[in-house]
Amino acid sequence: MTKTVLVTGASSGIGRAQVLTFLENGYRVYGVDKDENPVFLNELRFVKMDLTGDLTPLFTSLPEVDILCNTAGILDDYHPLHETSDEDWEQIFALNLTATMKITRFYLQKMLEKKSGIIINMCSIASFLAGGGGAAYTASKHALAGLTKQIALDYADKNIQVFGLAPGAVKTAMTAADFEPDGLADWVAEETPIKRW
């Protein structure tokens, strides 16, 4: 039986790479993103929407999944707390944490009924240390790591596998916009054992 996968943040970066990998391996893949479906991914079943809004269209078009990849997220331009507005804080938490919680909660119900499922949350190196982002991003990713650990514990005996991936700097269009203009990319590469990002 072909497994069904949902990838959030499917149009670019890590999410796009996940989509390509699952498609290459024969999975039925659904992607959701606020940006357009990349034109070369015609076999991707795509839902264009803002995950911080009403999620009903997503849940209606895809009532259950076997594998959930919560990959959508945003950075915060490395702002310290005194430069972070309430609006910026809330926007980052709305996508990086709250949307993931709501999507996971919905599909978790179906996974519990089937007694099977895999949830992969895209945490970050900023989930475990400071300096991987600004105050809002780092706090949101710490919270996501906590949520991931708790649901992994809560559903371990229900045949639901929960994983939190915590990559360091990955070169994507989103990170390049933050890293390259001020030479941060060079510093990241120097601080990384493989000397690249």
Can you describe what each PLM-predicted range is?
Residues 124:
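Residue(s) in the substrate-gating loop at a strand-loop-helix junction
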Residues 109, 153-154:
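Alpha-helical segment proximal to the catalytic Tyr-Lys
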Residues 104, 140, 148:
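Active-site helix of classical SDR
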Residues 79-81, 88-93, 184-188:
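Substrate-binding pocket helix/loop in short-chain dehydrogenase/reductase
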Residues 167-177:
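Short, flexible catalytic-loop segment of classical short-chain dehydrogenase/reductase
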Residues 11, 19:
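N-terminal Rossmann NAD(P)H-binding glycine-rich loop of SDR-like oxidoreductase domains
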Residues 72-77:
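Conserved NAD(P)H cofactor-binding loop of Rossmann-fold oxidoreductase domains
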